[in-house]
Amino acid sequence: LRMTLKKFGLWLGVVGFVAMLSLPAPEGLSDTGWRVAAVTVLIGCWWFTEAVPVTLTGSLPFLTLPLLGIAKPDAIASLYMSPVLFLILGGSLIGLAFEKWNLHRRVALMVVSKANPEPRSLLLAIMAVTAFVSMWVNNSATTVMMLPIAMAALAAVVPEEGTKVDASLQRHHRNFAAAMILAVSLASNLGGFATPIGTPVNSIAVGILERSYEVRLSFIEWMSFGVPFMLLSVPVAWWILSRVTLPFDFAGASRESIRDSIGEPGPIGVAERRVLAIVAIVAAAWVFLPVLEKTIPGLTDAGIAVAGALAL
């Protein structure tokens, strides 16, 4: 089925591309705009179906746009070397360092193991730590990492399947389980909005603003509205989940049972300390960039990200 979908996407993209180039541009759209639309259809079909490797699809604009007379090769190449891409690259490498040494898991275990074991408080703790980790690590990776921790905490609070409980309590347990899973997904997205590197979409938005409207948003300027949004939206999402969408109300487990269920993070190693130190320096440099620029002209968010990645 997957191979069939890939072949379908491959030929759908090619046929759509050729057909659009063979037809005149619709009224109100320039010939150049119509050719750009044809390239977009080709790339979209190949991207969504993964008809060819994603890296190859991403390189198509460099080939097709100059051939169709839409833009010159040097103009296209300059976009592939955009500072925003280096911000994404540096931020991604920092996130990978977190993942390699399980620092995100360590933070999560420390917070959740010390959280109030009452179900609603536990749900809020899971959401808070997920949102924090997602500020620095890719949303998908954060979700994959946090779900097992959330499920382990859930297992300590909710009795095993088959345990005899009354129907009302069973409904509360079921709602809590569903809320816990949804909470991780929601918090990952909300936390990802807090920083420019929280999700690639943020960095792309920064690049578009700078290139198209000459509006430059620094790391700290993005955080000035991204962090307050996260701090407001996470509690609101928690309240809606636990009180409206999937209400639950029952006694929780002891803090010891939750700690036993999710496990202990263990002693911190030398490599983890080094990664934490580098990340702390990078984060501080992003925050104090306006001050650092006076001493180090030309320093940018992307430069800081790359320097941090090289140090790792």
State each model region's role.
Residues 29-33, 51, 98, 116-120, ...:
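Alpha-helix capping and helix-loop boundary segments enriched in small/acidic/polar residues
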Residues 61-62, 140-155, 181-182, 194-211, ...:
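Re-entrant/interfacial helical elements at transmembrane boundaries that shape
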